[in-house]
């Protein structure tokens, strides 16, 4: 509705959601969900903290910090902060999983793996 109203006044708004429920990983979900906020947090928090340039431990700490602040942005209650921390943890677990799959040279292109990956992602999003 906002996009249509803005276009009536000649304003083109940036894409903010890109089918996030089709994502087959939590990382992909966050690339598709609330894109403008995600880009802001990436550019002004994650990268300012050092991003992924200072080793794995620092990268994980930067992810958690960024997601905690994203949770705080959604609301100033502990439930929002915990939610942000959980999603930071999910992103870390996904990065660790990807590294393990890469080390083991496992093929993840099959439809069964894709379906399971989507299901796990939706459980993270809906339950956590």
What feature does the model see in each segment?
Residues 1-128:
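Membrane-embedded transmembrane alpha-helical bundles that form the catalytic cores
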């Amino acid at each position: 509705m906002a996009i249509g109203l803005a276009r009536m006044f000649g304003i083109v708004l940036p894409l903010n959601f890109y089918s996030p429920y089709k994502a087959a990983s939590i990382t992909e979900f966050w690339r598709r969900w609330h894109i403008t906020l995600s880009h802001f947090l990436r550019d002004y928090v994650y990268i300012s903290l050092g991003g992924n340039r200072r080793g794995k431990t620092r990268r994980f700490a930067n992810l958690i910090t960024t997601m905690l602040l994203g949770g705080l942005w959604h609301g100033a209650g502990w439930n929002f902060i915990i939610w942000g921390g959980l999603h930071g943890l999910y992103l870390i677990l996904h990065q660790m999983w990807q590294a393990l799959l890469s080390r083991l040279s496992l093929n993840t292109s099959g439809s069964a793996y894709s379906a399971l990956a989507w299901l796990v992602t939706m459980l993270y999003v809906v339950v956590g």
